[in-house]
């Protein structure tokens, strides 16, 4: 009974931290759109998208690799032994994203200022740090501390952003506030001081596989605004799509925080009972996500646009059909997230990567074949096609007998 209460309390703390994280994200976006307008906020939205990609490449996979490795080892020694390779990965990603932002600065941000690549590099480096800190806290069973880390990151951004906008209404200043979120990690300096055990260094291939897979997942879910800009969508349309995604990703953001509670138990379940023990949960997640996506489409078509305008201001909402399709895609993303965590817990690197490669290929095919829908319609159709394939492929991989 005491163990159940403790687990419920820890899950409740993670839920609260995830909700705070989501609300602070909304607050940051609303602060930007109301202060800078739809067009003024557009370059900040692009930096936000880079941060989402960084979280996909670094925060999520590092966090879950740390939790899984500590569950298998029973101590952080293996994580400490492989930390150098993980740091090189994080540094390479940060440098690569910064160079991309520098090379494509005018097309993405509207000018060639150094502010944008510096901010992009900063958010990427911070994403790696947060993955390590959150993973060590959760892997050590300190779920309440992990909840504070999850919720506090965007609270720091919101507070710093409000202070900087009080100094001057500049998109560059607001983008700089995004870099400050990982300062919350300073509350747990010992999370970065892991003791070596002298054992063999564990394989870090799962970090790369999960990083690639979750990057592809975030390209699908968060890549719409820059893709829309590349296809010729105006700044107002980019902000409208970003605002719709920001609203309907709320459950996804909450679920991201809760996944840290699931990885260790799922890992132990697979170790004790085999990968087949995940067959029923995988199929249930797939069926539920498809069914709920249909309901989300029907509700968001009429109700979504006025809600988006109320939250983020005039000119920030797409049409009803697009809004409904964005909502459906975000619900499908919840299912693909659940299946991704199951595949990570099972150590199924090949199936994990292949499921998301297939999803991106499906999205690209739909994007190429729907030219008559216009830029916004093509992007949203590709989102839904990719998520459907990701859900189906992930469930099929876990349902296959081994």
Predicted regions and their residues:
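Membrane-water interface segments that mark the loop-to-transmembrane alpha-helix transition
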Residues: 9-22, 47, 51, 56-105, ...
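Interhelical loop/hinge segments that connect adjacent transmembrane helices in multipass membrane
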Residues: 1-7, 144-149, 171-172, 177-178, ...
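Transmembrane helix-bundle signature of multi-pass secondary active exporters and lipid flippases
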Residues: 48-56, 229-236, 241-260, 296, ...
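Helix-loop junctions and terminal segments of transmembrane helices
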Residues: 58-74, 244-248, 252-273, 344-345
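Signature of the first transmembrane helix
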Residues: 6-63, 208-235, 383
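Interfacial segments at transmembrane-helix termini and the short loops linking adjacent helices
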Residues: 38, 104-120, 235, 302-334
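Hydrophobic alpha-helical transmembrane segments
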Residues: 114-121, 147-194, 358-362, 374-400
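Membrane-interface junctions at transmembrane-helix termini in multi-pass inner-membrane proteins
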Residues: 126-148, 328-355
């Amino acid at each position: 009974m005491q163990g159940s209460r403790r687990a419920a309390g820890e899950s409740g703390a993670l839920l609260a931290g995830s909700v705070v994280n989501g609300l602070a994200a909304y607050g940051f976006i609303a602060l930007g759109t109301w202060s800078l307008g739809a067009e003024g906020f557009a370059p900040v939205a692009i930096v936000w998208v880079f941060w989402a990609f960084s979280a996909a490449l670094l925060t999520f996979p590092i966090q879950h690799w740390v939790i899984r490795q500590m569950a298998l080892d029973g101590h952080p020694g293996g994580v400490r032994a492989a930390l150098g390779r993980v740091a090189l990965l994080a540094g390479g990603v940060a440098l690569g994203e910064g160079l991309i932002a520098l090379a494509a600065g005018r097309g993405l941000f509207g000018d060639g200022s150094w502010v944008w690549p510096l901010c992009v590099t900063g958010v990427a480096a911070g994403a790696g740090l947060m993955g390590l800190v959150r993973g060590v806290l959760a892997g050590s069973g300190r779920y309440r501390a992990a909840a504070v880390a999850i919720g506090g990151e965007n609270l720091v951004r919101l507070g710093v952003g409000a202070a900087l906008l009080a100094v001057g209404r500049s998109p560059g200043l607001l983008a700089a506030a995004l870099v400050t979120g990982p300062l919350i990690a300073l509350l747990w300096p010992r999370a970065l001081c892991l003791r070596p055990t002298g054992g063999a260094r564990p394989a870090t291939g799962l970090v790369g596989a999960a990083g690639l897979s979750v990057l592809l997942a975030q390209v699908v879910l968060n890549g719409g605004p820059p893709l829309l800009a590349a296809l010729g969508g105006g700044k107002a349309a980019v902000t409208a799509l970003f605002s719709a995604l920001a609203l309907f990703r709320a459950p996804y953001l909450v679920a991201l925080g809760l996944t840290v509670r699931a990885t260790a138990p799922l890992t132990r379940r697979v170790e004790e009972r085999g990968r087949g023990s995940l067959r029923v949960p995988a199929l249930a997640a797939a069926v539920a996500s498809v069914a709920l996506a249909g309901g989300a489409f029907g509700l968001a078509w009429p109700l979504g646009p006025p809600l988006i305008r109320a939250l983020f201001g005039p000119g920030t909402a797409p049409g009803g059909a697009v809004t409904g399709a964005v909502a459906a895609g975000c619900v499908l993303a919840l299912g693909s997230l659940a299946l991704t965590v199951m595949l990570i817990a099972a150590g199924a690197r090949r199936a994990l990567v292949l499921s998301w490669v297939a999803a991106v290929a499906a999205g690209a095919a739909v994007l190429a074949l729907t030219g008559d829908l216009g830029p916004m319609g093509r992007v949203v159709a590709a989102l839904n096609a990719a998520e459907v394939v990701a859900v189906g492929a992930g469930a099929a991989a876990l349902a296959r007998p081994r």
